[in-house]
Amino acid sequence: MLYSPRLTDQILIVAGEASADLHAARTLHELQRLRPGLTAFGVGGPRLREAGLEALAPAEDISVMGLAEVLPRIPRILGILRMLGRAAAERRPKAALLVDLPDFNLRLAARLKKLGIPVVYYVSPTIWAWRQGRAKQIARVVDRMLCILPFEERFYEGTGVSARFVGHPFAERPPPGTPESYRSALGLPAARTTIAMVPGSRPSELKRLLPPMLEAAERLRAAHPDAQFVVPVAPTLDRAALEPYLAAHRTLEVRLVDGRTEEVVGASDAALVKSGTSTLEAGLMLRPMVVVYKLSWLSYAVARMLVKIAHVALVNILAGRGIVPELLQRDASPERMAAEVERLLGDRAAREAQIAALREVRASLGEPGAPLRVAEEVLGVMR
């Protein structure tokens, strides 16, 4: 369905980390297709900017995770929050599309609500895991909550939040090919043992995860001299950010690939993947993996008190059980990482059981078409 263009069709979009940037960019493409002439301003990464977003601030300035990591950035984050509030008051966008990043976006939503600007929130905060009281705040400041996990719409029943499961954006992706086909596409030797390492899209994640991943790679190379290691560089990062870590492992063969996380994982015999959206992105490639994560001691202590779920990896949450190993904090050591990857490389039954469970997770994500459904929701609330 096409909507008639209007001279003043402008919306506000805010997306922080790499996955949100991708989801928002695809939605913006659909919005522009449905309503030619529509423009957008706000905060986003490279994909949103390529799609036409007028970026008032870079995504990395607001995409910070963990209490200790956020504290030194608070002045800059609050400055961007105030700047977006002023921009919204001056430009009066027809609607706002806020993607993930709840600590920032819910505060912005409250400001937008006072201005009478309809708010569509895409990618629900994980209130089913912690801080469930936020449902009341969401009901006050969000007009439509668009959920990407199948159980989230039911969670909001009776809370006053207008929620809809729109399907997961990753459901758009075709079934994965063979490891050999991805290695060929990436220019990697097809016959060599290939291990993917996905350290994340934030500098703080690189700092905590890439060094132990590289040390684990050294151990794995000792057992597999032919092994090659591949690291996708998130769109929100520059290759130069990885160089200091790689410099300590000059004899280790590490191939950097700009973006293309799914292809890197698809090319692997096994993968080390940081917890978060990356685990689902990797899981959809149906490759055996180990999930790792580290926070500052303060952030982890707070999380342990607040989080109410048994698993942290998204694929485990969706499966309702531990289908992939989770190595957190001290357990995310080079020794444990190497041992778990070695088990997946050598134990055929463990590999096949994990892949079978990942197939079930993939099937639970709903039908393709999430960007279109989100675009229609935004157009539906536009003033």
Swiss-Prot record:
GO CC terms, sorted: membrane
Gene Ontology biological-process annotations: lipid A biosynthetic process
Family: Belongs to the LpxB family.
Catalytic activity as recorded in UniProt: a lipid X + a UDP-2-N,3-O-bis[(3R)-3-hydroxyacyl]-alpha-D-glucosamine = a lipid A disaccharide + UDP + H(+)
GO molecular function terms noted in the UniProt entry: lipid-A-disaccharide synthase activity; phospholipid binding
InterPro entries the record matches: Glyco_trans_19
Keywords, alphabetical: Glycosyltransferase, Lipid A biosynthesis, Lipid biosynthesis, Lipid metabolism, Transferase
Record's function text: Condensation of UDP-2,3-diacylglucosamine and 2,3-diacylglucosamine-1-phosphate to form lipid A disaccharide, a precursor of lipid A, a phosphorylated glycolipid that anchors the lipopolysaccharide to the outer membrane of the cell.
Species for this entry: Anaeromyxobacter dehalogenans (strain 2CP-C)
Record-given protein name: Lipid-A-disaccharide synthase
Lineage: Bacteria, Pseudomonadati, Myxococcota, Myxococcia, Myxococcales
Tree of life domain: Bacteria
Enzyme class: transferase
Pathway: Bacterial outer membrane biogenesis; LPS lipid A biosynthesis
PANTHER family: LIPID-A-DISACCHARIDE SYNTHASE, LIPID-A-DISACCHARIDE SYNTHASE, MITOCHONDRIAL-RELATED
Keyword set includes Lipid biosynthesis: yes
This enzyme's EC code(s): 2.4.1.182
